[in-house]
Amino acid sequence: MCKKEKHRLVCVTQRTACEGDFFRQMEAILSMKPARVILREKDLPLSEYEALVKRLLPLCQKAGVPLTCNGPVPGWTLPGCGVQLSFANRNLRGGGECGFGVSVHAPEEAAALRESPAAYLIAGHVFPTDCKKGVPARGLDFLRQVCEAARQPVYAIGGITPERVPQVLQAGAAGYCVMSALMKTANPVQLIEKFYHQEETAYEL
């Protein structure tokens, strides 16, 4: 069964960025109960991706954290996992009781999904990020417009640091996604504590 989200942080994986063991890194992250984990490892053959899902899913279930697949084959998932789709593949749906999310890059896309059964949207990239070198960030105004156009909760992605969390939440986002920082840090628990602290102070400004 997929449990209800509590925190606002979504962990997006990038196993190749981990200096140490990927699963030890994930165990530390899962101990902090993020809203969900999105397994984004599109470079893997499907057989290897499936093996990774089967190894990570029990860890997520033990922690009570939903696992979402975003692998090499659009719409592919396993029982017990959600699925993340691009806007182009939005009609694939899937994810069973864990549902599916859709990535959007324009307010018009969010508006087009108002009648969709998608559980949530991911909007980005909001701030400059090494993952999108040379591509201009869309900014907080873009995020506000997406949140206003959407029916579903919106999660921001791209260059999210603890210090930027208040701006993201005040723009209307339900939460935010973090990838590289969580994969590269030697102390994920300490980093996530900083993110959670900013969640608590977001509306005190």
Identify the residue ranges that each predicted region occupies.
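Flexible, gly/ser-rich surface segments that form the specificity/activation loops bordering the active-site cleft
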Residues: 124
